[in-house]
Amino acid sequence: MGRARRPGGRLRRVGLGTAISLGVGGIGIGLLIAGGGAVAVHRANTTEFCTGCHVYDRFAQTFEHSQHRANLTGVQVGCADCHVPDDSLAALLWTKARSGVRAAWAYYVEGLDTPEEFARARPELQADAHTWFVATDSQTCRRCHEVAAMDLQAQRAGARASHQAAATGRRTCVDCHSDVPHGQAPARAE
């Protein structure tokens, strides 16, 4: 016959003090990892981080003189404010990973490191961004620009109609504002 089991046998063999120490240590390590991850995500969402890559430095040049960077109010947005969703950590991490892989591919494989290569690729890059903004209903735009808070009566008729359509989901920001903030790219070569 086998040995009779005593309640709490394993815990008693390990020792209550050891179990508590392991639990507290595990929580501490988890907090350090989570804190380090939060710092890494925060730093990776800065404009300086984004534009540190040669692929994106030319987009940074087009952005520097836009209304989202240089304006009368002093409000400035960065790359992540427009290009990184904040609805979930998973969406944020997926977008950052996807962007990083695509940038590395463009730079190292496609050779997108000269002004000429950038000019050639810009229409496709902006078309990809436009597709993403349409697919997400321009949610990153809507974090700052709330149609419900706009004075529609003070707007011209065309803008008023477009913003009313955006409020009901029939239009999205980039349907009209596709040149914000990087300027209009030339038409994509087919």
What function would you assign to each model-found segment?
Residues 2-190:
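Short sequence/structural segments immediately N-terminal
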